[in-house]
């Protein structure tokens, strides 16, 4: 038991030289023996232990059973056994996650320990003992939760020097507890070491649930009894003739008695010449491994009467123990008979010579089982009929009892009426009618009854006050424990996120290394290339295997992100699959590393922002990105800021009704583009999703809203992004209106896409200014960037960037306008400039430009490039460049129109000439 392990050093310290005394015992002087009990008990520190009644059992044998409880400080476990002398505990109660409760209306001394798995009902001898146990259990639980962890083998072990601070905090916590419930004094004789000297519990306290432990404890006690009896029957002549006082006996402690269920290695060795009283003390010491110092508390100078009383008590205890042993022997005998019967059946089965005989035995047993089953069914039916009959009889008895009670009440009422009338008649005879009788006895009875009620109410009030104080302290302490556990959990989650981010970084570097090796080797070495292909395949499949084998992973890379986009793009080419996995790992790593350092302060700033007002602070916050929980609200405000002069109530519903009345010319093209909208998003590919229907209605409503544009390819992606964030059709519709009609130039989505072409030329000039080396490299290989960047501007990167970065771009785009698109377009090329410069072939550059935007995973780095490295970037310069290139483009378009008109005129003149020539020939043929 745990108590033995804890008490061992204390006992040895309180009795120095115990080992020498055990080897060569000497008789102590009489003056030292007189105070031996007091000194031994004072030297022992207070331990939380004692006898409590535990309510348990099943069915008709449920009831209170006395158990010995003791607390283990290292494990925060409350162990209990049948007696204090048992070597092995019956069971334990985990107090680390338990709460305590006491009912004011319950029987005195009853309280409960509630754990997540069960509720244990206990009863103390007195109310004071109950409050003492509750308060001590609260303190032990708080000490366990507030205790510092074991010092690690790292430099952090220096934190172990904060012991005084922890003691100070513990003192403060105890002081706070005292404000709720006053400290309860230790009940004498009911709690602690002294409680173990009480008599053993009765026989009915044997635990049938823990029969194995009971057998072990009984065998241990039997061995102790044999040793005690052998010591007690020594010849009396061996007693010390020099002194009539018993010799003080000490013994070395068990080496490991703290472990429940483990017996001590060395049994205690008695002194050579003990008296009868010392023999009894030695027996108690051997039986009680948890408290090896009980025998130190026995008073030395006893009279003959006290010795006789001790012997009688020992005889009584042995008699009770003998009864319990007989009961145990009966139980074991029944178990042995069952085992022998099973053995006989097995022997008969094995002794059968042929399979037929064995089959006949099996059939015989089956028939017996069937017969027994039928008998059980018959008995069950009989039991049910008897139970039904008994219930009917019980109902009849209850009805008769109610009838009898009613008759008795009537009789009692009639007797009271008769008594009152008799008293009244007597009073009328004894007192004249003009004199009012005085009834002091009745007044006294009323006063006493009222006083008794008041006393009862005072007792109830005191009980409820005590319960309230205890529950307040319990709630206060549980709340503090919960906060402390929450802080620990938060710290562990932060540490796990950091470790997972580092793991993602290492894995991405590993995959990148495999990719480079694969590119470097090529087809030179078939064995090496085959090995690399296997490693790449294992790396690509490792995520799914790990997710299936480890069900408690903190935050695995999900297939879809929070907006439904695929986190790892599904490419067909093996190299692109590996690149997509690397990009997903890097993105996950940057996200995890930025959770605490960046995202948490950003969320706090957004939470404290309050009402949205255009300002420089809001501009910086939008550039940093809007947290997901605030993004719908912020986008609605930004859209309303753009379209408040266009917005009219009921406009969207009116447009929908107009579309239902007649079909729009662009409806067919819209229907074709619905299936091509974000094939990498589950909300638009799932057959049961409502997003495609919402998108169809939004695009049709916009076609009726803006007839000059109607519908243009690319609007479906803009509306889809708005739907994913805002989720409401009308909000997404007005977001599309804000982008097309207020943010983008007027002819951005017209038939000629004039403004879009102008922006491509402006981007070329800005790239030449900001990234001249890159533009020279692209010009050397004749790479036309507009083939890649045209779609960026048309759909605001909707098909290019991963969703985490894309939505940050949109946050700033909805507030600042198209300038943000130019900034991020330049930043994307700056981000990948080194990779592009390494490529020395135009075809390789085009292949890389197809997916290089998906390799961007560090959103913070990209944002820093866009809004810091690309400065200065003035809107005035952007307008001037747009104006210059618009004039050039319009001149080119006019020239093209003129050339087109000249060509059409020449072709028409040719057709006329050809038609005239053909007619003359026909006429000639007709004349002929």
Swiss-Prot record:
Q: What is its main location?
A: cytoplasm
InterPro entries (alphabetical): PH-like_dom_sf, PH_domain, Rab-GAP-TBC_dom, Rab-GAP_TBC_sf, Rab_GAP_TBC_domain
Localization per record: Cytoplasm; Cytoplasmic vesicle; Cell junction
**Stretches assigned to coiled coil:** 298-416, 875-913
Q: In which tissues is it expressed?
A: Expressed in a broad range of tissues, especially in kidney, liver, lung and placenta. Also expressed in keratinocytes and epithelia-containing organs. Isoform 2 is differentially expressed in prostate normal and cancer cells (at protein level).
* GO cellular component terms, A-Z: anchoring junction; cell junction; cytoplasm; cytoplasmic vesicle; cytosol; nucleoplasm; plasma membrane
Ranges for the region named Interaction with RAC1 are 295-433
The processes (GO biological process) annotated in the record are: positive regulation of GTPase activity
Cited Gene3D superfamilies: Pleckstrin-homology domain (PH domain)/Phosphotyrosine-binding domain (PTB), putative rabgap domain of human tbc1 domain family member 14 like domains, Ypt/Rab-GAP domain of gyp1p, domain 3
Q: Where is this region: Interaction with CADH1?
A: 1-169
> Domain named PH: which ranges?
45-142
User: Extra info from the record?
Assistant: 'Armus' means hinge, linker in Latin and ancient Greek.
- Subunit-structure text: Interacts with activated RAC1 and CDH1.
> What is the recorded name of this protein?
TBC1 domain family member 2A
